[in-house]
Design a protein with these regions (language model features):
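Short polar catalytic/cofactor-binding loops
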Residues: 9-14
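Glycine-rich phosphate- or other oxyanion-binding loops that anchor nucleotides, phosphorylated ligands
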Residues: 15-127
Length: 127
């Protein structure tokens, strides 16, 4: 089955299927990057989408931000694989520019919650 648009989100509470127009498919991955990767690959194979929209709820560092934001770049905020790559970078990822969108905001993705100030995140202008 082919679809024009596939929306990937973690939880049904983030975006209800009923809110979508016909012809748009949505998959719920559950929480976590491993779940998201597995379910996303299965959905891509099942629906062969022309476009994929990753939709979700995130925290924020910048108190001025509200609403729906278009992310332009993502860094792995809790990835520290030095000396193989600098903090925030995934080692051996040779084409990170291919994963960017036209949005203006920087998302710091991670496998943990940010519970304290991190000067590194502020220095990288993570939103």
């Amino acid at each position: 089955m082919k679809t024009e648009l596939l929306i990937i989100t973690a939880l049904e509470s983030e975006l209800k299927r009923e809110a979508l127009p016909s012809g748009v498919e949505i998959v719920y991955t559950g929480i976590g990057k491993i779940n998201a990767a597995i379910i996303s690959i299965k959905a891509i194979h099942q629906y062969s989408p022309k476009r994929i929209l990753n939709f979700g709820t995130v925290g924020k560092i910048n108190p001025q931000l509200h609403g729906l934001l278009e992310i332009g770049k993502v860094i792995q905020r809790d990835m520290d694989a030095e000396p193989l790559a600098p903090r925030g970078s995934t080692p051996f990822c040779i084409r990170p520019q291919e994963y960017l969108s036209t949005g203006q905001f920087l998302c710091g993705s991670g496998d943990s919650f940010v519970t304290a100030q991190d000067p590194w995140l502020l220095s990288k202008d993570v939103d």
